[in-house]
């Protein structure tokens, strides 16, 4: 069994300029979210029972936070985003993660190149990581499969091969439909950009994003 915590990655402080990058989420996670979960739910404590994963911008947060706090996490899932410097820090750390999982869509060329670079570094260091590429772009077709493959690894022994991951049988979609549902509507995925959302804080300094057409 596991508890999945999906918190807001935007952690602006009172008086902080509300920009797109999500403030001090690391502090929010370590000093507020983790203690709250441990104090209010029946969970096992310690890094062996804690993992972190994220997609797109969330993958950057994951690699940054895990790299700085290797004693707090035993696994990292990086979906569609490779922060080279942070991944190198994870590889070079004296602490070793039980699971390092990277993934992206087959059309995300820049991310695929970064993943290959990190794979090679882990291999040269004698450390283990899993890298998966799925049909798709920077979108949910890829991230759903990434999560589906990542989660079982948290309950398996070290050294499991990527090909050993059981795959869910899904109907293969045509390339035309894939493009229609992803690339052609890519801008819709970035709803804040598409709708011109304004990232602001309320009087208490809490995130208060507003759409221009919503009072």
Predicted regions and their residues:
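Non-catalytic cap/lid and distal C-terminal segments of serine-dependent acyl enzymes
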Residues: 1-199, 205
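Exposed regions on extracellular, virion, or secretory-pathway luminal proteins
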Residues: 207-209
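Short, intrinsically disordered, charge-balanced linker/junction segments flanking boundaries
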Residues: 211-214
């Amino acid at each position: 069994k596991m508890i999945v915590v999906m918190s807001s990655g935007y952690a602006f402080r009172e008086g902080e300029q509300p920009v797109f990058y999500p403030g001090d989420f690391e502090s929010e996670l370590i000093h507020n979210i983790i203690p709250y979960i441990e104090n209010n739910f029946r969970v096992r404590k310690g890094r062996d029972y804690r993992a972190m994963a994220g997609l797109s911008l969330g993958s950057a947060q994951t690699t940054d936070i895990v790299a700085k706090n290797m004693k707090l996490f035993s696994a990292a899932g990086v979906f569609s985003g490779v922060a080279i410097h942070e991944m190198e820090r994870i590889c070079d750390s004296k602490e070793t993660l039980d699971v390092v999982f990277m993934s992206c869509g087959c059309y995300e060329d820049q991310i695929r190149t970064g993943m290959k670079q990190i794979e090679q570094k882990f291999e040269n260091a004698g450390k283990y990581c899993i890298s998966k590429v799925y049909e798709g772009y920077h979108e949910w077709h890829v991230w759903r499969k990434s999560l589906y493959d990542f989660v079982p690894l948290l309950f398996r022994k070290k050294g499991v091969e990527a090909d050993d991951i059981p795959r869910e049988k899904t109907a293969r979609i045509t390339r035309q439909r894939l493009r229609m549902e992803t690339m052609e509507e890519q801008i819709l995925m970035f709803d804040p950009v598409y709708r011109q959302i304004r990232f602001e804080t309320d009087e208490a300094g809490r995130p208060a994003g507003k759409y221009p057409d919503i009072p």
